[in-house]
């Protein structure tokens, strides 16, 4: 699983990660991750809010410096083109599939548009 990892990688490194995973995966192998279709733009305001919460606790960290901006390849199509069967679900659908409602809070609002990716190597 590469959940929570992709936004911390430069766009080219994201592609290389999935290229390496594909090269090393036998048929039937699985990978799971999430993808933010609007990139890090949607995360910016929330990251600043979260950064302020950390600062209030004495942690001097600019969270926006931890993520990489830039145009990324959408993960689902990228994996499909490389021989993976891909299932994509919006975050609210994932919550509903587990019988949960999506929380209405500032902290998780930035995840509302994220897409959960599950893929099986063909």
Where are these regions (language model features)?
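Alpha-helical subdomain
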Residues: 1-122
